[in-house]
Amino acid sequence: MSLDISNYPLLALASTPEELRQLPQSALKQLSDELRQFLLTSVGISSGHFASGLGTVELTVALHYVYNTPFDRLIWDVGHQAYPHKILTGRRDKMHTIRQKNGLHPFPWREESQYDTFSVGHSSTSISAALGMAVTAEKEALGRKVVAVIGDGAITGGMAFEALNHAGDLHKDMLVVLNDNEMSISENVGALNNHLAKLMSGRLYTTIREGGKKVLKGMPVIKEMAKRTEEHLKGMVVPGTLFEELGFNYIGPIDGHDVNGLVETLSNMRDLKGPQFLHIMTKKGKGYEPAEKDPIGWHAVPKFDPTQFRKPATKPGLPTFSQVFGKWLCDIAAKDEKVLAITPAMREGSGMVEFSQRFPQQYFDAAIAEQHAVTLGAGFACEGYKAVVAIYSSFLQRGYDQLIHDVALQRLPVLFAIDRGGIVGADGATHQGAFDLSYMRCIPNMVIMAPSDENECRQMFYTGYCYNEGPSAVRYPRGSATGAEQIEEMTALPIGKGVMRRQGQKIAILNFGTTLAAALTAAESLNATVADMRFVKPLDEALLLELAASHDVLVTVEENAIMGGAGSGVLEFLASKNRLKPLLQIGIPDEFIKHGGPEEILSELGLDAAGIEGQIRAFIER
């Protein structure tokens, strides 16, 4: 994507932070405007995360202007807001490739740039990483500064507060910037806080404050009185008491779209000792009216024309698996008021908007707190309620101990609706749902289901709802369903029983999940038997023994890591019965899968029809 210098005269001069720092401060306002316009244009071409980046343009410019990056360490939490950072750190001309196969990574990524000091994608990790870097910076004594940027959503995660607590205790030199795009403050209060922030971050205030501490060191009563007076005065206009109590010097809130004000405040704070906390107010979607009005809807966008001020119309088509879940949840809640559903800040993505509106007393958003969400469900189940935890596969990893200790160990009937199982595509390695079958299969008392289509998915949700002997999980992929007819009537499936889908000879394909259509297509060319296993745990042992006895070769197919997955379960069972046959496991290899289109990734992994057939033929010919 070449840069039209006539439209971006200053941005053309700031390809890297080193070039940015050569510009006069008076040019930063225009540079920010050009950067925001370039972001609009580039995301319109590429698709991707949108509203968050529009809100951090001025902050990004100010941070790279004040801090000596990459020597100074800058860590972005999650990374949705880091597109301006990528543009200013040598990747401007590749922005049209972001989230595409062999293109720029969707998040800051250490392997991609020296300016990406910590690879991210999941929430609430930045402060812990920054503290680790601050500790080592002190040991090296090179004068390196460390900054973590975290949003008001990510800071709700427990890990962020654990890190804040530890950072306050260790008292290392570091800065945490809270990008707050939720709170609304009036202009008067905002102006007061902007002035107060400059005053309190300035050298005069800091010198008086630290000098006063030394003078009053021998007079503890007066020192305590002075401390309380300062806290009281700050508390009247500054909502930062919590962070002060954690050991941080709190500054703010200030206007996050005043680039010159940010530069002044950051310049003052850069050399302050100990943990610093800067609270800035921004507007998600800043500078693009549709995104300002609907920041959730414009959080991530497909390719679009920014001049049209609307996203392209969605073509009517098949429902997504998330929508199938949302409809089932509404249907069952209408019949049972003891159904309580939980999501860790993924209402829209998990298909729960309608449910939250129709059944607000049965809906719980636990925020970005997966550990809490899982154990909250355990608490519901203890009291005889039916807990449904809707969670992404890659995020359930963060509540793994709770899944084992708080749910499975107590055999609590919590139903996990695990979205984004398998390949998710453009969000890349941090979000691929490659491990859930493996990490759940080893947990005692778990029932794990993998539907082959949307109707089977609906019936499995009902099966989990009816199951009261312990926890159950239904894992399903991102995106559109298969087009199977959905049967409104809900019927509980027999636990641990698969079904035959095609009778063939010599080769038996044991399919787990939505790869069934590809497996059936491959089976036509191979004249292979196909079984829709349905249950990863417990396995249909009778069906496995029957297929092993009547076929020469067994093949397992799953959109999950081969290591420890459903195929491993089949192999373990047959070995325990001394009924081993040549067995090919088809799935995700032992590597992190990069970003790209889901179809092209599945094809590359050999998980489409041609790939399944090719792998089976190669296995037979060995």
UniProtKB/Swiss-Prot annotation:
Q: For binding thiamine diphosphate, which residues are annotated in this chain's numbering?
A: 80, 121-123, 153-154, 181, 288, 370
Q: Which GO terms describe its cellular component?
A: cytosol
Q: Which Pfam families is this protein grouped with?
A: DXP_synthase_N, Transket_pyr, Transketolase_C
Keywords attached to this Swiss-Prot or TrEMBL record, sorted alphabetically, are: Isoprene biosynthesis, Magnesium, Metal-binding, Thiamine biosynthesis, Thiamine pyrophosphate, Transferase
Question: What does the cofactor section's free text say about binding?
Answer: Binds 1 Mg(2+) ion per subunit.
Does Protein biosynthesis count among this protein's keywords?
no
Q: What is its EC number?
A: 2.2.1.7
Top EC category:
transferase
Reaction catalysis annotation = D-glyceraldehyde 3-phosphate + pyruvate + H(+) = 1-deoxy-D-xylulose 5-phosphate + CO2
**HAMAP family recorded:** DXP_synth
Instruction: Name it.
Output: 1-deoxy-D-xylulose-5-phosphate synthase
**Species this chain originates from:** Shewanella amazonensis (strain ATCC BAA-1098 / SB2B)
